[in-house]
Amino acid sequence: MGKKTGPNPTDRAKGGVKRSRLTEARGIPVGLVLDGANRHEVKLVDSTLASLPPAAEAARDAHRAAGGEQGLCLGAGYDSKQVRETLTALGYTAHIRPRGEEVQAKKAGQKARRWVVERTHSWLNRFRHLLIRWAKKPENYLAMLHFACARITWYNCLFG
């Protein structure tokens, strides 16, 4: 495989890629970073937040100026002191469920917040070229990811 791949922790014989995404409340992708599949999520937080386009940063800043709180929902893999400190320094309120708490909340009838990101995973995996990585160069794969994200955004703006 090409660059930006690493040993897949679930399938030792193949290389894999990790797509770290930042989505808005409806699941529309606004930030994207690629790395090897063996890279831990905690190490991708800074680069994923830095991948926000200027328009999204302007909207975020306007929301904060109006007194709005900017929350960030993350999975249990992000539950670390380093991530919480980074998010606090950048002005985000972290919503990170510890491992096992999501099962308890499901029993209590609460809805999980991460389903929006999981839906975005599903939308991107509908593009066969992304589901099975054929591109050797990370630039080509990243370009296809950006194209798919643009198409998802366009579709949601028209029909969303």
Residue ranges and their predicted role:
Residues 103-109:
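Short, charged, surface-exposed secondary-structure boundary motifs
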Residues 1-93, 98-99, 148:
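Polybasic low-complexity intrinsically disordered regions
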Residues 86, 90, 111-160:
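Basic, amphipathic alpha-helical segments enriched in Lys/Arg and hydrophobic/aromatic residues
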